A protein has these predicted regions:
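Beta-propeller domains
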Residues: 28-47
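Structural signature of WD-repeat beta-propellers
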Residues: 31, 40, 71, 80, ...
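Anionic-ligand binding region
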Residues: 159-160, 164-196
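A short loop-to-beta-strand structural motif that recurs across blades of beta-propeller domains
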Residues: 35-37, 75-77, 124-127, 167-169, ...
Length: 280
């Protein structure tokens, strides 16, 4: 099942769900007690903050701030490199965050945030948080537990995992920033997809909460199982994936069910991330 591809980058983390590469070359991950971890290339781990919540997806800006989807506090928390914690957004007055799950920046510093809602309620939302924290509901049309997300290379599509929909949907981003009608890009029956990362050639890599599986989906092609762990030892609820390293040539995988971040050479180069200067 290709598990031999994977080695441990770092261990001793508290059930990391989200993972992201920062502009400083460090890998950032969250923990189930609200921890924010910084992982050096040699695997050294430093806990730089804890919100006391439950950290899901994480993303960084061009100034080294970390934005964590804090399920425990129902907010997006902004954490500076020194560990100072601020509330960046808690949704809108009419639609406060319930399950902020993952986030992705565009070039202008707008942060797209998925809120999964209730598992069986199909009431998930996607928010758009402008630089500084002003927040609107951007789309309510991918309601089936929206989860991991990322922007296309050109920044004109937002790809969203719908975990309960067993699919990857995509939403066109208009010139004015508005959301177009969604369309299903890839069906993933028989699993619970969670996180997504794009390679520079458009290949999608998808981590699944159930079963312990990672998919590779070539452009215009069918999903292929890259790796699967029937014992949940190497890949233990591999919820999120991110390309890391100076050349973006290794795929890092978080383990919500365990304590480690694994990495593998999967024969692909990651799409360069956006690190906007957000200010605040």
């Amino acid at each position: 099942m290709n598990l031999e591809l994977f080695t441990e980058l770092a261990g001793g983390l508290d059930h990391p769900e989200g993972i992201a590469l920062g502009p400083d070359g460090l890998v950032y991950a969250g923990g189930e007690a609200g921890q924010i971890y910084a992982i050096a290339p040699d695997g050294t781990v430093e806990q730089i903050a804890s919100t006391g919540g439950f950290m899901y997806g994480v993303v960084t800006d061009g100034d080294g701030n970390i934005y964590g989807c804090d399920f425990g506090r129902a907010q997006v928390s902004r954490i500076s490199g020194s560990g100072a914690i601020q509330r960046y957004s808690n949704g809108t007055p009419d639609h406060p965050f319930r399950v902020p799950n993952f986030a992705a920046f565009d070039d202008d510093g707008n942060l797209y945030v998925t809120d999964s809602g209730g598992w069986a309620d199909d009431d998930g939302l996607v928010y758009r948080v402008a630089p500084g924290g002003s927040t609107v509901v951007w789309s309510h049309e991918v309601p089936r537990f929206p989860n991991g997300c990322c922007l296309s290379a050109e920044g004109d599509w937002l790809y969203v995992i719908e975990s309960r929909g067993r699919c990857i949907s995509r939403i066109a981003i208009g010139d004015d920033g508005s959301a177009g009608p969604p369309e299903v890009a890839v069906e993933l029956p028989g699993c619970q997809p969670d996180g997504i990362a794009l390679a520079e050639d458009g290949t999608m890599f998808v981590g699944c909460y159930r079963p312990d599986r990672i998919y590779r989906i070539p452009p215009g092609g069918q999903p292929e199982i890259l790796a699967e762990d029937p014992d949940g030892v190497v890949l233990n609820q591999p919820t999120n994936v991110a390309f890391v390293g100076p050349e973006l040539d290794r795929l890092a995988v978080s383990s919500l069910g365990g304590w480690s971040v694994m990495v593998a050479d999967v024969g692909a180069i990651g799409l360069a991330l956006r690190y906007p200067k957000v200010g605040w």
